[in-house]
Amino acid sequence: MPTVNQLIRKPRIAPVKRNKVPALQANPQKRGVCTRVYTTTPKKPNSALRKVAKVRLTNGFEVIGYIPGEGHNLQEHSVVMIRGGRVKDLPGVRYHIIRGVLDTQGVKNRKQRRSKYGAKRPK
């Protein structure tokens, strides 16, 4: 434990906080246009074809967003809304595309956790 004199000479420094979603610029969501929609494979223990889209945001950032749920209608030039939230087994994917907003349709036949996938209440 340092003495008072040592702390006066060299004070404690707080660790630097790193922003995990810099492209949002302190906004909850951002709008963007898909420039490329494709599938990619996850990191080592997992195996799948994950659906992702490269999105050019309104502030000029170009980010990769994950498309959650089963099936989607996105293609190049689709206008999407993006939120923060990384996908742990896809390096470089730090954003999620919000389903049921703008050009993105909700997931069909979704019964549970509907609000997360933009699905309407079944009749």
UniProtKB/Swiss-Prot annotation:
The keyword tRNA-binding applies. PROSITE patterns: RIBOSOMAL_S12. The modification 3-methylthioaspartic acid is found at D89. GO terms for molecular function: rRNA binding; structural constituent of ribosome; tRNA binding. GO terms for cellular component: small ribosomal subunit. Keywords: Methylation, Ribonucleoprotein, Ribosomal protein, RNA-binding, rRNA-binding, tRNA-binding. Belongs to the universal ribosomal protein uS12 family. This is Small ribosomal subunit protein uS12. It comes from Brucella anthropi (strain ATCC 49188 / DSM 6882 / CCUG 24695 / JCM 21032 / LMG 3331 / NBRC 15819 / NCTC 12168 / Alc 37).
